[in-house]
């Protein structure tokens, strides 16, 4: 139906938006059909929202920030929060019932199929190539979206690590970004002009 001009909305389980192309291929959908009919992909998840009444401000260590691809110097003005863990003799927060979290907030990754992307899909491009093209066109990843919520005080690094951050996922994102930037010899992460060492693995830059 999509090939004949109808707007078709469907759901599919995949780790992120770029991985959806591979999932369609596994289901037997030919690449040329995907490139001709697909206009966009939205990947979404839910994170627990940290309780605004009992959350605790703190300063993450560089190692913790590095795990998420963040640099302490760039996050100096950000107030990070973590969930409050109540002790046995402490009154329970009436708003979150002592869980430290109340409600949920959505995170989204929107991949728009543009001409260059469609051409790559029709040629059977790998997920890494699809991800690289998506990042170059301005796609905000699930990790990037969730870290922005952390900066706004809506959730925690702990929750992002639990629900979003995976070694393979972060490595794929780093690899895609590194293809068009200077690359760390230690972990392959993309580097920027002026960095003396890799913020992710602390390997000195040569």
Regions found by a protein language model. Give the residues of each.
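Short, flexible helix-loop junctions that flank or precede catalytic/ligand sites
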Residues: 1-206
